[in-house]
Amino acid sequence: MGNIKFLLLVFFLIVVVVNGCWEEERNALLELQTNIMSSNGELLVDWAGYNAAHFVDCCFWDRVKCSLETGRVIKLDLEADFGTGDGWLFNASLFLPFKSLQVLLLSSQNIIGWTKNEGFSKLRQLPNLKEVDLQYNPIDPKVLLSSLCWISSLEVLKLGVDVDTSFSIPMTYNTNMMSKKCGGLSNLRELWFEGYEINDINILSALGELRNLEKLILDDNNFNSTIFSSLKIFPSLKHLNLAANEINGNVEMNDIIDLSNLEYLDLSDNNIHSFATTKGNKKMTSLRSLLLGSSYSNSSRVIRSLKSFSSLKSLSYKNSNLTSPSIIYALRNLSTVEYLYFKGSSLNDNFLPNIGQMTSLKVLNMPSGGNNGTLPNQGWCELKYIEELDFLNNNFVGTLPLCLGNLTSLRWLSLAGNNLHGNIASHSIWRRLTSLEYLDIADNQFDVPLSFSQFSDHKKLIYLNVGYNTIITDTEYQNWIPNFQLEFFAIQRCIALQKLPSFLHYQYDLRILAIEGNQLQGKFPTWLLENNTRLAAIYGRDNAFSGPLKLPSSVHLHLEAVDVSNNKLNGHIPQNMSLAFPKLLSLNMSHNHLEGPIPSKISGIYLTILDLSVNFLSGEVPGDLAVVDSPQLFYLRLSNNKLKGKIFSEEFRPHVLSFLYLNDNNFEGALPSNVFLSSLITLDASRNNFSGEIPGCTRDNRRLLQLDLSKNHLQGLIPVEICNLKIINVLAISENKISGSIPSCVSSLPLKHIHLQKNQLGGELGHVIFNFSSLITLDLRYNNFAGNIPYTIGSLSNLNYLLLSNNKLEGDIPTQICMLNNLSIVDLSFNKLYGPLPPCLGYLTQTKKDAEISWTYFAENYRGSWLNFVIWMRSKRHYHDSHGLLSDLFLMDVETQVQFSTKKNSYTYKGNILKYMSGIDLSSNRLTGEIPVELGNMSNIHALNLSHNHLNGRIPNTFSNLQEIESLDLSCNRLNGSIPVGLLELNSLAVFSVAYNNLSGAVPDFKAQFGTFNKSSYEGNPFLCGYPLDNKCGMSPKLSNTSNINGDEESSELEDIQCFYIGFVVSFGAILLGLAAALCLNRHWRRAWFRMIEALMFYCYYFVLDNIVTPIKSRWYKNVG
C-alpha cells in the first residue's frame, strides 16, 4: 500500500511539473519580451499576446523549447532578421531565471553592449549553458571575448559580424576587464569568429587554453599564411575554415602537417599558388576534405602540389578556371580522392574523356560551370564505382552516350538544365541503371514516354524530375506496375501533357508532387491525396482542372503546401479545410472561379501563406482572418474578389503578418490606428471603399516597404507621422480626397515610387522635391500644386517618370531637368508654363537604362524552391524573419504603373512595356519660341506632344531622326514654313498632327506611314496643299474662317472679343446712319415709322395693363374684402 501511495505521489509530481512550464520562467519570458526587439523596432515575439491567450503552457510558445522531463526552458531562439534597428544593451539578469538553459541564440539582435554589471560574464550562473550564438551584433570582439570567457560550461560559441561593421566601445564597458584573468572555456569544442578582419590569432587567448577545440571558423578575416603555425595551440583541431582571408602565395606544408588531427580545411577565396614543402618529404595523413578555388591564378600548379595530402578523400575547387589541359593529369596523381566538387568551374574539353583513370572516384560534381559540347562515350563512362554525377546547368548538347549504362553503381544523376535531346526510351541505358535513387533530367529537350516503362526494372528510385521536356504517348506499356515508391515526382511544364501517367495510381509514398504548368483537364486528382497519406506538398497550378475541389476522406497530418492556382475550379471553398489538413502551411487557390463566402475554418494554427485572390468570393471575411488571429499567418492575399464589410477591426493584431493584399474588393470602414505599427512589409488596400483619415504612426516603423491606398474615399491630410516609416519604398495614395500639402519630411524617406495623383493636394513643389536621390516615379497629376518647378529637381538622379500634368505650375521649364539622365517619361501638360523650350531636352531619353519597373521585394524562382520550402519549414520553426527562403517563394507583383497620353488616348504602362516606353508631353501650356533642333536627337522617343502652345518658326528637319517615334503632335501653335520631307522616313509613326498652324507648301506624299493620315492631321493650315487636303497645289488656297487657332486660349479669346466689339460698333453705326438717311429723305417712310412706334407703345401699355396690373388689383381687393 505504501508503494502505491509513493508511486501515485511521483506520478502527481510528474504531471504537475511536466504539464506546463514553471511559473517563474513564464513570468521571466513575459518580462524578457519587452526587451527583445527585432531589427525593425517591433517586438520580436508576442508571448504576452497570442501565445499567452492560446497556450497557458509557455513550453508551446514561439521560440521556446522545454525539457520533456522537467518542463524547464532549455532553449531560447531569439534570432532576429537582418535590419537596421536601434542598438540595445544586454541585461544578463533577464536570462538568469532559466536555470536549465542550454542554448541561447541572439544573432542579429543589434546588441551594442550591456548595462552596468549585467554583461555576458554573468551568464556563468547558468551551469547548463552549452551554446551561445551572438553573430551579427556590433560589439568589439576583444571586449566581447573578455566577458564570455567566464562561462566555463560553453561548448559552442558563435561570433561574427558583417565585414563592413566598425566598432566603438560604449562607455558602459569595463575596459580593464581585458587584463583580468578569467576562468577560460576549457570545454569549448566549436568556435565561430567570422568577419572581424583580424590578423592576430592571439586575440582568442582571452578565452584561455582551448585544448578541446575541434571546430574553428575564421572566414572573412585578414589572416595570412603564418596563421597555420599559430594554430598549434589547438591540438584537438579537426575542422578549420579560413575562407576569404589574405592567404597568398605558397603555403608551407610543414605548418599544416603539425595540425595532426585536422580532417577538414577550407581555403577557398584566397590566392594560393601552391602547397610547398621546404623541409623533408613529410605527408599529411589526417586531412580528408580540402576546399579551394575562386581566385587562384595557376590552378594546375595548385593541384599538382596536393600530393602531400596523402589521405585526401574530398577535393572541392569552386568558381575557377580549370581549362588547362594539365589539370586532368594533376588530378590523376591524387589516387585517394573519391569526391570531386567543381561547382561553377569551367573545365577543359578533354576532362571527361580522360578522367576514367581516377578509378576510385565515387562523386563527380560539376554544376553551373558553363561546360559545353557533347558528352563523350569514353573516359567518364569507365568510372565503375561512381555513385553520384551532377552536370546541372551546363551547356551540354546532343544525345546521351550508350556507355552511360555502364555506370551500374550510379545512385544520383542530375542532367537538368542542359540542351540534351532524344527519346529516353530508345535505348537500354535506364534499364541498366537500376541502382538509381535520384534522377533529374528536367529542362532539356528529351522526349519522355508517358508510360515511364523504361523504369520498370527500378526498385530504389525515390526522386524523379522530368519537367520542362516533351511528353510523348506510348500506349503499349500503359498498365505496368512499378517496383519503386517515389517520394518526389515532378513533371511540370511539359509539352503535350494532357493526362497524368498511369503509374501514379500505384504510388503511395509521395511527399512532393509537382504537376503544374501542363494541359491537365477534368476534376482535380484528389485520389493522389487519398493514396499518398504522407504527402507534404502538391503543386498543381497553371492547368485546366475544373469542378469543385473535394477534400480527401481522411485527415492528412503531413500536408503542408497546396497550390491549385490558375485553374478553372468552381463552387465553394471546402469547409473545415483546417481540420482536413491541420499542419497546412501554405494554401494558394487564386485565379480560379471559386464563389461564395470564405469558410471560417480555413485558417489553421500553422497556416503561413493564404492566397485566394482573383476569384468570385463574396460576403464578409471570417473573424479569424479579420483580426489575423492565426499566430503564423505571414502572407494573406484576398485581392480581386467581391468581398465586403469591415476587414479591419479594433482587434486587428497581425502577429507576424507581413504581406496583406486586399485590393479590388468592396471593403469599407476606417483604417485601424495600429496598421502601421504591425509587422507589415506590404499593405495593398487599393480600389476599395475605405474612408476616414489616414492614421498616424506614433513611432518608427522599420518594416513597412510598400503602402498602396489608392482609389478609396480617404480624406484629410497626409499625416506627418508617415515620416516614421523609415524604410518605405512605395507610397501610393492616388485618387482619394487627400488635401493639404505633402509633409516636407517625406523627402528624407528612401522612397522610390510616389503616386499621389488625382487628389486635392496643393502648395509648392519646392517643399516636396529636395533630397529624393532614390526616387524613380513621381506622379502628382491632377492636383493643385502651384509655383515654379524647383531647380532642385536636378537632384533626383534616379528619376525615370516625372508626371506633373493638370496642376497650376508656372514659369520656365528649368534646365536642371536635363540633368536627369534616367528620365524616360515626362508629362507637364495642362499647366501655365511659359518661356522657350530648353534645347537640352533633346538629350533626354537617349540612354535607356534598366529602370526598376516593379515594387518587387522578392523574386520567384520555382526550381527546387517548393522542396526547399517544405524541408526548411520542417527544420526551422520561426520562418518569418528569414528573407532567404522568401526570395525563392514570392513575387510581389505590385508593379509600377504610369499613365501617359499618346496617340490621342491615355494609356497605362507597366511591366516590360513601361521599361521601353519614352515620351514627352508639354501640351496646353504657354511655351513660346522656336522648337530647338536638338529635339531631333531623341532617337529613342516614342511620343512627343507640343500642341496648344505659342511655338513658332519651322518644324526642325532633325525630326527625321526620331526613328522610334509613334506619336507626334505639333497642332495648335504658330509654326510656319513647310513640313520637312524627311518625316517620310519615320516608319513607326502612327499618329501625326500639325493642324491649326501657319504651315505652307505641299504635304508629304501619301505613302508609307503618311498614307494612313487623313486631312484632320493638316486642317487649319490654309496654305497647305496636296492630298488628302481639298487644296490642290498650284491653285489659290481656300481660306478657312478658323485658319489660325492659337494654342493660348486666353489670348485667342481677347483677340476675338476685340474683333467683335469693332465689328459690332461699325455695323450698328452703319444701320443707324442708313435708317436716319431714309427717314429724312422720304416723308411717307417717316410717317409710317412714327405710326409703327406709336402702335407699338399702345400695344405694350395694354399688354402690361391686362396681364400684370389688373390681376394684381383683383387679388388685392379680394384679400381686403
From Swiss-Prot:
It comes from Solanum lycopersicum. Glycans are attached at residues 91, 224, 298, 321, 333, 372, 406, 531, 576, 588, 689, 771, 822, 937, 945, 976, 998, 1014, 1041. Pfam families: LRR_1, LRR_8. Involved in plant defense. Contributes to resistance against parasitic plant C.reflexa. Acts as a receptor for the 11 kDa glycine-rich protein (GRP) of C.reflexa inducing immune responses such as emission of stress-related phytohormone ethylene, reactive oxygen species (ROS) release, and hypersensitive cell death. Recognizes a specific pathogen-associated molecular pattern (PAMP), a cysteine-rich peptide 21 (crip21), from GRP located on the cell wall of C.reflexa. Interacts with an 11 kDa glycine-rich protein (GRP) of C.reflexa. Interacts with SOBIR1 and SOBIR1-like kinases; presence or absence of GRP has no effect on interaction. It is a single-pass membrane protein. One of its GO terms (biological process) is activation of innate immune response. This is Cuscuta receptor 1. GO terms for molecular function: pattern recognition receptor activity. Residues 1080-1121 are cytoplasmic. LRR repeats lie at residues 98-122, 126-152, 185-209, 210-233, 234-259, 260-282, 284-308, 309-331, 334-360, 383-406, 407-432, 433-457, 459-479, 507-531, 556-580, 581-605, 607-628, 630-654, 655-678, 680-701, 702-725, 726-749, 751-772, 773-796, 797-820, 822-846, 914-938, 939-961, 962-986, 988-1012. The chain crosses the membrane at residues 1059-1079. Gene3D superfamilies: Ribonuclease Inhibitor. InterPro entries: Leu-rich_rpt (IPR001611), Leu-rich_rpt_typical-subtyp (IPR003591), LRR_dom_sf (IPR032675), RLP_Defense_Trigger (IPR051502). It is found in: Cell membrane; Cell surface. Residues 1-20 form the signal peptide. Belongs to the RLP family. GO terms for cellular component: cell surface; plasma membrane. Residues 21-1058 are extracellular. It comes from the Eukaryota. Its main location: membrane.
